Amino acid sequence: MNIPNSPLRRVVIIGGGFAGITLAKQLTRHNLQVVLIDKHNYHTFQPLLYQVATGGLEAGSIAYPLRKVIQGFPDFYFRLTTVKEIDTQNQKIISEIGDLHYDYLVIATGSKTNYFGNKEIERNAMSMKTIPQSLNIRSLILENFEQAVLSKDANERNALMNFVLVGAGPTGVELAGALAEMKRAILQ
C-alpha cells in the first residue's frame, strides 16, 4: 500500500462516508498515523442524492474528493481499494492493493438498504444510496416522462408518470416532492 512505517500508532478507517471522514478530521488533533480507505475516491453527500435522481444537480456537485479531506495533515493517507479480509489475529487488513497492519481499526462502511423482509420490494425496487443508483433512477424517470409525452393513451401516460416510493424518511419525502415538481413544471 506504500504507507511509510512510523513510530506513531496507526489508525485505519475503512469507509469515507460521514462517519469515516468525521473521525479522520477529529483525529487530526492527535499524534497518530491515519489511513483512510474507500472503494471510491470521493465522498457522496447522500442527503442530496434525490437531487441527482431528479436532475436538480449533477453528480459531481455531491461528490467530494476524499484526498482533500486529509490534505495537508502530516501522517494522513488515503488509499483507493476494496478491503477483502480483516485479520484481527494479526491486526491487518488484506485489500486489493496489499496488506496493511493497524493498531486501531474503524469500520465505517455505511448502511445497506433494509427491505424489512419484503422480498417483492427487494426484487423490484431501485435503491438510492450511491451516485450511480441515483443516475439510474434519473434515467428511468426521464425515459418514462419521454414515453408519456409520446403516448396518446391517457391511462398509459398516467402509469408512466407515476412512481411508487418505498420509505418515508427524509430521502423518500424529498424525492416525492421533487418528482411532483418535475411532473408539474416540466410536463404541464
Residues of each region from the PLM?
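Beta1-alpha1 glycine-rich phosphate/pyrophosphate-binding loop at the start
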Residues: N2-F76, M161-V164, P170-Q188
